[in-house]
């Protein structure tokens, strides 16, 4: 029988209690004279998955990176409006390292650190002094088990992460993000370079993480948004065009731009084409 993990309180997965709510309020973003996104107001309910859809250049990735303040040091970046986390502006003068413990991020391509597999997982735990060194392996085992990677790496925790496959590296990066117990997890096309098996595994993890986290994910994959999203927001040419429950947005879009973008996913009148996909939306919500 598998022994129960005894994690330090600071790194034990919290019991969902309402958690944080992130909110963008009249947010305008730009770089120099160019405005990338204009007057976006959008709520992210606690313990839910919100997917951000839109064509390339619509502003959704700039928006996502702003939620983590990743754009702060980009030349010419400017913003007006606000983003609130737990009712407090994220743009206040604050410790960005501590802020990013609360708002984690997983990128399109895996970015393991040049250190051992175990040290990767506990990097944030060590930096934030969330657990004593003697408990690092316990923390690493818990998070690697959660993402389904423990059995593959348990005998090679001292190895370089660059010896892992691309999919395994992405799972390692997810374990690292989860090890510090963020309130919000931002995902920037996290499966775009992965094989179907790993993609399915990560999508399942996203759904299970929504039991305790606020998850916000950029994706270009309509089917992925349908499978994972509780809510979906559609961006087009620097505007938030439409947002709402994923089922409603996929089956009953209200704006012309949304209808056109979702057309390949929705069956034509009197046709069965795409019916399995739209049925999946209806059944998953």
From Swiss-Prot:
Pfam families named among the record's database cross-references: ABC_tran
Similarity-based family: Belongs to the ABC transporter superfamily. Phosphate importer (TC 3.A.1.7) family.
Biological role: Part of the ABC transporter complex PstSACB involved in phosphate import. Responsible for energy coupling to the transport system.
GO CC terms, sorted: plasma membrane
GO biological process, one term: phosphate ion transmembrane transport
Sequence intervals crossing the membrane: none
Protein localization: Cell membrane
Record's protein name: Phosphate import ATP-binding protein PstB
Membrane topology field: Peripheral membrane protein
Primary location class: membrane
Keyword terms: ATP-binding, Cell membrane, Membrane, Nucleotide-binding, Phosphate transport, Translocase, Transport
Oligomeric form and interacting partners: The complex is composed of two ATP-binding proteins (PstB), two transmembrane proteins (PstC and PstA) and a solute-binding protein (PstS).
Domain ABC transporter: from-to ranges: 22-262
Binding site for ATP: 54-61
Listed GO MF terms: ATP binding; ATP hydrolysis activity; ATPase-coupled phosphate ion transmembrane transporter activity
Comp. bias regions, Polar residues: 272-285
Tagged with keyword Ligase: no
């Amino acid at each position: 029988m598998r022994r129960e993990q005894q994690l330090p309180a600071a790194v034990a997965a919290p019991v969902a209690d309402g958690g944080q709510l992130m909110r963008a309020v009249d947010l305008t973003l730009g770089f120099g004279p160019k405005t990338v996104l204009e007057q976006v107001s959008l709520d992210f309910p606690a313990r839910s998955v919100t997917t951000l859809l839109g064509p390339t250049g619509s502003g959704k990735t700039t928006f996502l990176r702003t939620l983590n303040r990743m754009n702060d040091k980009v030349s010419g970046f400017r913003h007006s409006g606000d983003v609130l986390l737990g009712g407090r502006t994220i743009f206040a003068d604050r410790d960005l390292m501590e802020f990013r413990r609360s708002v984690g991020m997983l990128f399109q391509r895996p970015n393991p650190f040049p250190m051992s597999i175990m040290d990767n997982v506990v990097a944030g735990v060590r930096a934030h002094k969330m657990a004593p060194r003697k408990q690092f392996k316990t923390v690493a085992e818990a998070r690697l088990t959660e993402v389904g990677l423990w059995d593959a790496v348990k005998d090679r925790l001292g190895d370089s992460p660059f010896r892992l496959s691309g999919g395994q590296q992405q799972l390692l990066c997810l374990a690292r993000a989860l090890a510090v117990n963020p309130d919000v997890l931002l995902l920037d096309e996290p499966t775009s370079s992965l094989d179907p098996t790993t993609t399915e595994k990560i999508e399942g993890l996203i759904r299970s993480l929504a039991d305790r986290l606020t998850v916000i994910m950029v994706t270009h994959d309509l089917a992925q948004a349908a499978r994972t999203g509780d809510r979906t927001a559609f961006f087009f040419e620097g505007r938030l065009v439409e947002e709402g429950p994923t089922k409603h947005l996929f089956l009953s879009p209200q704006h012309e731009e949304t209808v056109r973008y979702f057309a390949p996913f929705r069956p034509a009148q009197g046709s069965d084409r795409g019916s399995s996909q739209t049925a999946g939306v209806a059944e998953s919500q």
